[in-house]
């Protein structure tokens, strides 16, 4: 990454005699009573920044959170092929819910209870109906920042509690039947 923010970070760390290291797939860090496992990017590419996203899981007790950045189908397939344990309580849905992320095979390995889609107004149609449909089919409770604002998932090591800043009961992933019922009542 060569954004201005990253360049500034590199300069500040160099001024302090520090270096930036990038985690590699298969590496892990103990972080207090939690653990962070890194799964991607498997293949780094300057030309494909989405698939160059860090994919990592934070494990705390019996709960875990999988963060997929903007990883798309190709990176998901490479991670699946590597054989990592991707199961997670919470999935931060990849690439704002684009049709090229959170593929069915990837989702089947994760089987999350909750999914968080970080998305705002956009011209790309994110999150796409394809991705929302896959999450519905897997019976995953969906939270969306565009509808619910800040979303906080808290773990006590046994269970995860999710709270939202607004509209906690929003229909974040309605079925076609729910959509038509809602349209008829307005």
Regions found by a protein language model. Give the residues of each.
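Non-globular, low-confidence helical/coil segments that flank catalytic cores
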Residues: 1-186
């Amino acid at each position: 990454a060569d954004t201005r923010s990253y360049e500034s970070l590199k300069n500040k760390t160099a001024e302090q005699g520090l270096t930036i290291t990038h985690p590699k797939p298969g590496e892990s860090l103990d972080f207090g009573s939690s653990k962070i496992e890194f799964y991607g990017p498997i293949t780094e590419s300057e030309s494909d920044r989405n698939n160059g996203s860090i994919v990592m899981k934070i494990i705390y007790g019996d709960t875990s959170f999988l963060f997929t950045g903007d990883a798309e189908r190709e990176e998901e397939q490479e991670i699946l092929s590597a054989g990592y344990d991707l199961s997670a309580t919470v999935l931060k849905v990849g690439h704002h819910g684009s049709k090229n992320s959170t593929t069915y095979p990837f989702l089947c390995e994760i089987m999350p209870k909750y999914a968080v889609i970080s998305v705002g107004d956009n011209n790309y149609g994110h999150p796409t109906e394809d991705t929302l449909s896959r999450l519905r089919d897997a019976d995953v409770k969906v939270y969306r920042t565009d509808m619910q604002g800040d979303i906080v998932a808290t773990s006590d090591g046994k269970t995860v509690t999710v709270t939202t800043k607004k509209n906690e009961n929003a229909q974040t992933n309605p079925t076609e039947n729910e959509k038509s019922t809602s349209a008829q009542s307005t």
